[in-house]
């Protein structure tokens, strides 16, 4: 695991859309994560961790 991935994982736990944004930009992954985070914090975290570590 690289340092960048570690930082993205930490950011995904603190603020899920930010971690996804740093990895993918404003693509569909970011918007899905943002919507899931608005529906509930836990779904946003789970999706962000899944998509970053995939």
UniProtKB/Swiss-Prot annotation:
Keywords: Membrane, Transmembrane, Transmembrane helix
InterPro entries given in the database record: PMP3 (IPR000612)
Induction pattern: By low temperature. Also promoted by abscisic acid (ABA) and dehydration but is not a general response to stress conditions.
Paired cysteines (S-S): none
Keyword Transmembrane helix: yes
GO cellular component: membrane
Record protein name field: Hydrophobic protein RCI2B
Source species: Arabidopsis thaliana
Gene: RCI2B
């Amino acid at each position: 695991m690289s340092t960048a991935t570690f930082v993205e994982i930490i950011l995904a736990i603190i603020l899920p859309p930010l971690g996804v944004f740093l990895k993918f930009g404003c693509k569909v992954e970011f918007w899905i994560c943002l919507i899931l985070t608005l529906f509930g914090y836990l779904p946003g975290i789970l999706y962000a961790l899944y998509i970053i570590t995939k």
